[in-house]
Amino acid sequence: MHEVKQPRRIMVVTGEASGDLHGAHLIEAAGKVDPGLSFFGVGGACMAKAGCEILIPGEDLAVMGLVEVLGHFPTIWRAFRKLKKILHGPQRPDALVLIDFAEFNLLLAAQAKKAGVPVLYYVSPQVWAWRRGRVRRIASVVDRLAAIFPFEPELYQGLDIDVEYVGHPLLDEFAITCERDAFLRRLGLDPARQVIGLFPGSRKNELKYIAETILQSAVKLREKHPDAQFLLPVASSFRRQDIEALVAPYGLPVTVVDEPIYDVINACDAVISVSGTVTLQVALVGTPMAIVYKMAPLSFAIGKRLIRVPHIGLANIVAGRGVVKEFIQEDATPAMISREIDAILTDAEYNRSIRGGLATVQQRMGEGGCAARVARMVSELCREIPGKERMV
């Protein structure tokens, strides 16, 4: 008989479309850094394509806000119990990698701690924005933290957690693969006419509270720009036919696309976007935008008391100032949003000032190589515990 090492099994959990993409790049990088790693867990189409065994679709869990979470609680609770059982079972993973999705993932990290499974958190909770006191809770259940912003490590100084700044994952993923005019012609659109991007988000509750406002803003915008064309990319968490059905009643010339996101952004003269990771993607391309944020009134009232930063859009947070306008809750009206996009399209000096501010965001996001750094951290974390071996 001889000993044969089994592949290290890594559980990965994310509930966001952006996390699905980051997870996919991590898995691909891990294949080069340590081919002995295999991945399973919660994610989407991107992670599945990269070779991850998807036990629970991430889109089933992707909700934001207290009221919204309560509405999806049975589904979320079933998923949590399933993962908890695996962590405490005979086939428990060699490590747990958590990507964003803070509240769910911190509960899962606590279970991993009890089960003796080491935990790495990638795209960690935004403690710099709200509920900063969570750093102690995070340090108590997470072994290693891959920080994507340079100001994050200092938040954990003096705590028993290994924090490493790895850079932002979007820098690894950034690529424009098709020139603007060629891209638009391939979609049957006219490159000589203005193109507006409509980005209503990747979560179900974002569609519920924000999509209508964004589409109504597009209707309003056509009063001044009747020749405008609209692009709406489909997030990996949704089906194309569902988005097309959502758009149809508005009578807009919207082309719903399942194309590389940076090609879509590059084709746009302006973008109306939700407040999350996509604002950083738009910033990397340098396209001027307006940020829209709406949620259930009770969730917003609670969140407003907890948030510590003056801006809600990630692009503005990274810039440290209001580079692009934010339209939040009651201020998120079609009239105000369409007026901002009109200014972007017609005021050349204003347009240039926004692009200059977005260049600041690009500079502050650091350098590429994030996925490889995190893959190395995962491999190291696994080597810190005895390898599973079987006799044959």
Swiss-Prot record:
One GO-annotated biological process of the protein: lipid A biosynthetic process
Protein name (database record): Lipid-A-disaccharide synthase
Domain of life: Bacteria
UniProt family annotation: Belongs to the LpxB family.
Record's keyword terms, sorted: Glycosyltransferase, Lipid A biosynthesis, Lipid biosynthesis, Lipid metabolism, Transferase
Role summary: Condensation of UDP-2,3-diacylglucosamine and 2,3-diacylglucosamine-1-phosphate to form lipid A disaccharide, a precursor of lipid A, a phosphorylated glycolipid that anchors the lipopolysaccharide to the outer membrane of the cell.
This enzyme's EC code(s): 2.4.1.182
Pfam families named among the record's database cross-references: LpxB
HAMAP family tied to this protein: LpxB
A GO CC term assigned to this protein in UniProt: membrane
InterPro entries assigned: Glyco_trans_19
Pathway: Bacterial outer membrane biogenesis; LPS lipid A biosynthesis
Gene source species: Syntrophotalea carbinolica (strain DSM 2380 / NBRC 103641 / GraBd1) (Pelobacter carbinolicus)
Annotated catalysed reactions: a lipid X + a UDP-2-N,3-O-bis[(3R)-3-hydroxyacyl]-alpha-D-glucosamine = a lipid A disaccharide + UDP + H(+)
GO MF annotation, one: phospholipid binding
Keyword Amino-acid biosynthesis: no
